[in-house]
Amino acid sequence: MALVSLPPQKLLERLALPSGPVSMVLDTDTYNEIDDQFAVVYSLLSDALDVEAIYAAPFYNSRSSGPGDGMRKSYDEILRLLERLDHPSAGFAYHGSERYLEHLDTPVQSEAVDDLIARAMAPRDGPLYVVAIGAITNVASALLIEPAIGERIVIVWLGGHPQYWPHTREFNLGQDVLAAQVVFDCGAPVVQIPCKNVAEHLRTTVPEMERYVKGRGAIGDYLYQIFADFHTDHFAWSKVIWDISTIGYLNNPDWVPSEVRPSPVLLDGATWGPEDPSRHLFRVAVDIHRDQVFGDLFRKLAQHA
């Protein structure tokens, strides 16, 4: 389903490594666990990133009664983070989709989708980076409603596993396969940050959080508390903060090595099909330098405090 007709050279330009100030929106299932909160804060404390809006994404796990409830809880969590950062929420935080994409050609309407389309189509120098760290129905729906945004955005998504992995049923992609198919097939510029063997390197511990996050203002104390409360037994325990991978990539792509390849074929069973060299290109992360990303986050928290 090619919705976007970017010339190959223009697509390559859009897939070039980010440099200088980046205009972005963040699409996040903020309440599904505790890593999105770190990504929200990291993005807002990054001077090189101009975060124009934050969208709540749907999710369904033990922390919600369904995708819509997950989206609403994520929206409320976004507000809690903004309050602790003294950042206004009006005209900045938006409710997203109440459900996942159910048909490849039928978008899910929401205020987040409307805002994304309006921002993407507004005059600007360079692309709008759409950073998605949850189920990707909001982004897919915007592309289905207004395919022209695909020529004006770059999608950076934490979702799925590498193509060499036997399946790609991780949380973000596995609950939203149809939306992921729209995104990978549409022809828009996509940067994928896989979970297995890439983002999963971003592990940290309670002692490290206590040393470098706790006491860094109201937001540092909040991040520390939700991290410490997430697991009862902290002995020999670490936790992956998956979502900061996307923000680390935008702050310094050298920290998240990547390569350009033909866009993958996502099958209905959440596995990858054989690579097709005739498909449009995308960029995929192949590694991540954990210490550089966490070091940058810790320094920004200290400076903010």
Predicted feature descriptions by range:
Residues 1-305:
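N-terminal acidic, glycine/proline-rich low-complexity segments
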